[in-house]
Amino acid sequence: MASPAASSVRPPRPKKEPQTLVIPKNAAEEQKLKLERLMKNPDKAVPIPEKMSEWAPRPPPEFVRDVMGSSAGAGSGEFHVYRHLRRREYQRQDYMDAMAEKQKLDAEFQKRLEKNKIAAEEQTAKRRKKRQKLKEKKLLAKKMKLEQKKQEGPGQPKEQGSSSSAEASGTEEEEEVPSFTMGR
């Protein structure tokens, strides 16, 4: 057997570094502390709690043996049984009414969402069409200007060309002026 003195000699356990006690003053600090603790050991799996299932009443009993009424004899234990069954049934009906109301509200919300989406798409299409029209107008004016420069030719005097181009650009400027200004 080994001597008791030899078995009690162990290397000392590594000591944990002391952690400072930090009391979070607000939700942001609390979140920061939780993140720091998670990031100390990134290999460790993070426990993600599952969504709690919504409360639902027990389904009604498939078979009720003794159907008793509220007029059970005074002092009998039957009244309590009736009362509990009635309470559960009312609870179940209230739950079904609440779920029907919730489904109705969800359906209305989805309809409103779809309606808003369609309206937004129509507005976007209208604006896109307007932008495209303005762009085409600018391109057309640019082409007209280039054609006029080509038609003038190098042989004509610059004074006449500049006056005719000034007249042409004046009409073009009137055409180019948009009915609205963007970004104001």
Swiss-Prot record:
The lineage of its organism: Eukaryota, Metazoa, Chordata, Craniata, Vertebrata. The gene is PRKRIP1. Residues 91-152 form a coiled coil. It comes from Homo sapiens (Human). It holds the Pfam family DUF1168. The keyword Nucleus applies. This is PRKR-interacting protein 1. Keywords: Coiled coil, mRNA processing, mRNA splicing, Nucleus, Spliceosome. Required for pre-mRNA splicing as component of the spliceosome. Binds double-stranded RNA. Inhibits EIF2AK2 kinase activity. Belongs to the PRKRIP1 family.
